[in-house]
Amino acid sequence: MNKALTLLIAVAMTTSCNKDCITLNEQNYLVFGHFYGMCAGEGCVETYKLTDMKLYEDLIDDYSGQNLEFVELENETFAQVSDLVDFFPNQLLSEEETVFGCPDCSDGGGLFIQYSDNGNLKSWRIDQFQNNVPSYLHAFIDQVNEAIVLINN
């Protein structure tokens, strides 16, 4: 019994979130999207806002990510991408840098990521070319791109 309790505590400690894990609710949300400068059409700038219960799409499609106006999407679409937060690299929260690589410098596009923690915004622009960014971002880049594809299908 003592061994089982010790094992249970050890598992809980190693799998539980530390203070850097992000949580989503109405105030804490994740904004994600991509942008391509040398591009024409609706898909050049796509930005979304994910909360714990809903997914929203930006209507403005502002390349800079400064002007955002969101409308709610259907619950089925939310369900397809609601786990994106699980792939968010916690290390990103402690980064001093806000730009990784050279997003869209060679027409390869970039990702716009923003996290709101009780109104405190942190934003990043990330190069789509994974050779130009830290390896801990690679899986998240892939997941963001996959989420955008799922939303638009």
Locate the predicted segments by residue.
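Sec-dependent signal peptide recognition
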Residues: N2-L8
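A short-motif feature that recognizes glycine-rich, charge-decorated loops
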Residues: D58-L93
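Short, well-ordered, aromatic-rich surface patches in folded extracellular/luminal domains
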Residues: D20-A40, E69-E76, S94-N153
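Post-signal-peptide N-terminal segment of Sec-exported extracytoplasmic proteins
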Residues: Y36-L68
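C-terminal motif of bacterial Sec signal peptides marking the signal peptidase cleavage site
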Residues: T14-S16
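Non-transmembrane, membrane-adjacent beta-strand/coil modules in membrane-associated proteins
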Residues: E46, D86, E97-G101
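N-terminal hydrophobic targeting signals that begin at the initiator methionine
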Residues: M1-N2, N18
